[in-house]
Amino acid sequence: MKSSLLVYALFLVITFLFYSSAGTAGTLLNVSYDPTRELYQEVNTAFAKFWKEKTGQEVTIQASHGGSGKQARAVIDGLDADVVTLALAYDINAISEKSGLLPKNWQKQFPDNSTPYTSTIVFLVRKGNPKHIRDWDDLVKDGISIITPNPKTSGGARWNYLAAWGFALKKYGSEGKAREFVSKLYRNVPVLDVGARGSTITFVQRNIGDVLIAWENEALLSLKELGKEKVEIVVPSVSILAEPPVAVVDKIAERHGTTKIAKAYLEFLYTAEGQEIAARNFYRPRLPDVAAKYAGQFPKVALFTIDEVFGGWQKTQAGHFSDGGVFDEIYKGIR
């Protein structure tokens, strides 16, 4: 009798575990950068529906947002991210190098160097553009108040800095002149927020500053929410191609048993549906058909890449943004 009861109890446990695993794929944590909240709210809902229809399993996707550099540090320090979707490749490189949680060749996991969408850097100004800001040169004039986040913590801020440096390098022809230009720009910055969304709040809600140097997607979102009666977008003559990458954090996903779902989640970003969601949230899609559909949404701008002008992220981070680097020297000299 006892043996029969034991067999029956074991049968119930196995049955429960079978149906539990068939009904849920568990929980994913996406550690992302600051202004992607709206994007991933929509992606997460769409992917959960897609996965349920495909597998019958329910999945819960949680998200953490903040300055890209801070988010990378949090993962290195123990935040259990199944996937990371950060502002720039260096931050994921740092996770790989300092924690060993994903391989050094992580950018080979997905197409386009694991960058499913792109963006660039533009200016957001107040209605009527009262300070007549047209290009980067206008930002270094006396009396201009610029809002941009801190490059030590924010990925978007690093793109802002590099866009300004690249403009000056192309126009004035030397690293010395570019450094002088960027120094003048930061003299006009009254406050450095931790992340890009914080800077948007400073400019839009706290009404500080004449111009916000911003992710294109963040500027377009602000224009959509506030309307032309509040803000306008100014597209500079030249800017940088910003490529925010994605990666599965392999060792954490393996430990959680979420590797399959984590990979599928990031692959979803490359599908027609995922690309449509990116475009609706003002990120430039990679898929040609979707890019053509939304071409009118994105202004034409001459773009350079970090590899072309700066030699890639490893060199750029070490020279400009590491402790004691060029940014620290510039900021120390003006404060």
Residue ranges and their predicted role:
Residues 128-134, 153, 166-174, 252-260:
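Short helix-loop capping/hinge motifs at secondary-structure junctions, enriched
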Residues 31-33, 125-127, 145-171, 185-189, ...:
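Short beta-strand->loop
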Residues 171-237:
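Ligand-binding pocket segment of bilobal, Venus flytrap-like solute-binding proteins
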Residues 8-19:
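Bacterial N-terminal signal peptides
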Residues 25-153, 302, 331:
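N-terminal segment of the mature folded domain
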Residues 253-335:
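Extracellular/periplasmic juxtamembrane helices and adjacent flexible linkers that interface
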Residues 1-7:
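Positively charged n-region of N-terminal signal peptides that target proteins for export
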Residues 19-25:
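Sec/Tat signal peptide C-region and signal peptidase I cleavage site
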